[in-house]
Every structure is written in C-alpha cells, then in structure tokens.
C-alpha cells in the first residue's frame, strides 16, 4: 500500500538526526488516527491565506484568524500575520488561485505538496508554499532545507500549468522569499534518498 503523508510530516522526519528519533516519529505517525484539526497549529492561518485570491486580497482575514485561536496561540499568530502582511505590502503582491500537487516516489510514497497560494510580484507569477512556523533551532527552515523543498515542488505532478510561473517558499518568521532555480541532479538524488529512507523506516516500524 502506498504511504501518503504531508510535506510537513516529511520535513519533520528529515529534521531528526538520530535513528531513534526517526523511529519514534514514524511510530507516532502510524499510531495516529489521521488528521484532526485540533492537532493542526496553523490551520486558521493557512485557511485565511487560502481565502485571499477570492476576497480581492483583503488582509483583514488574517487578523480574523488571530481572533479565532486560543489565547496561548495569539502571540505566535500575531507575529506571523504581521510578518506576512509586511511582506505583501513591501512587495506589492497580488494573489491568484493555485491547484493541487503531489510528489510520487516509485509509487511507494506520495507527498501532498500543493502550493498555499499564487503570488504575482513585479509582474512574475509564483506558486508559493508558506511556512509560518516560529523558528526553533532544531527545525529551522534554512537554505539547505529550502533547496530540498523547492526540488520536491518542481518535481510534483500538478493539476495546473507549472510552466507559467516559478515555485517559491515564503519563510514568514525571519522573513525570506526563496525562488526555485533549475533542478540540480545531485539535489534530486538526495531527495530520493531521503524518501527511500522514510519508506524503509516506515516499513521497519
């Protein structure tokens, strides 16, 4: 049976250094009953971003997301919302709808990797994956991890015309906008090695 996971799950697995940590993470995922909204910290933030192409880019929906979350989340949500809005304002961004995309590794592993939103910046179209996470040392979204993400995004099977724009990653905290470049053979091979490692660990647990 093909393993189906989210991009976040794959990145979390990759971030663990020790085999023991990877084992425990896979065990937790296999024992999990599946997705539940209460376990999705950034659900309200992402849903607000998804609405932007349909409300003429009205950013007030992001403040609505802050109002909806529990008190213990408000500080992180407020920081991410303010950083996202500052990025949009500084770059005169307009939004458009994007479709779905998945990355398939030898029909053994499928990773859901749909862009969160389409952005037009300086007349250029970008299919953007947004990472609002408050950065911690053990899971920091650095240039190395972003390169792997962008390689995966470019190799996805998408239901929209990917040749009309460029894949990109927006790191919301410690803000930075990463644009995809031509895929390097080495990066593609490293990605497949990580995927094979995930499959092997999954099957061994």
List the model feature ranges, each with a label:
Residues 121-182:
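Nucleic-acid nuclease catalytic cores
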Residues 36, 40, 72-75, 144, ...:
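Alpha-helix boundary/N-cap detector
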Residues 68-99:
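Acidic-basic catalytic patches of nuclease active cores, encompassing PD-(D/E)XK
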Residues 166-205:
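Domain-level recognition of nuclease-like catalytic cores that cleave nucleotide substrates
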Residues 54-56, 152-163, 193, 197-200:
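Structural alpha-beta junctions
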Residues 108-112, 116-128:
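Active-site beta-strand-loop-beta-strand hairpin of nuclease catalytic cores
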Residues 101-106:
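Flexible, glycine/threonine-enriched loop-and-boundary segments that flank and lead into catalytic domains
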Residues 1-71:
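A structured, charge-rich N-terminal accessory region that forms the first stable segment of a protein
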């Amino acid at each position: 049976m093909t393993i189906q996971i989210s991009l976040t799950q794959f990145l979390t697995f990759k971030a663990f250094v020790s085999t023991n940590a990877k084992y425990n993470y896979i065990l937790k995922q296999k024992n999990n009953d599946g997705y539940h909204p209460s376990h999705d910290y950034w659900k309200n933030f992402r849903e607000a971003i998804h609405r932007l192409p349909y409300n003429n880019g009205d950013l007030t929906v992001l403040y609505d997301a802050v109002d909806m979350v529990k008190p213990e989340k408000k500080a992180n949500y407020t920081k991410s919302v303010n950083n996202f809005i500052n990025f949009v304002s500084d770059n005169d961004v307009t939004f458009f709808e994007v479709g779905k995309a998945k990355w398939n590794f030898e029909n053994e592993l499928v990773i859901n990797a749909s862009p969160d939103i389409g952005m037009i910046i300086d007349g250029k179209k970008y299919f953007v994956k947004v990472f609002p996470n408050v950065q911690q040392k053990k899971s920091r979204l650095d240039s190395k991890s972003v390169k792997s993400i962008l390689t995966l995004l470019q190799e996805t099977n998408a239901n929209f015309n990917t040749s009309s724009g460029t894949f990109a990653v927006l790191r919301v905290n410690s803000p930075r906008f990463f644009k995809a470049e031509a895929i390097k053979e080495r990066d593609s091979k490293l990605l497949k090695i990580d995927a094979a490692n995930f499959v092997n660990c999954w099957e061994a647990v």
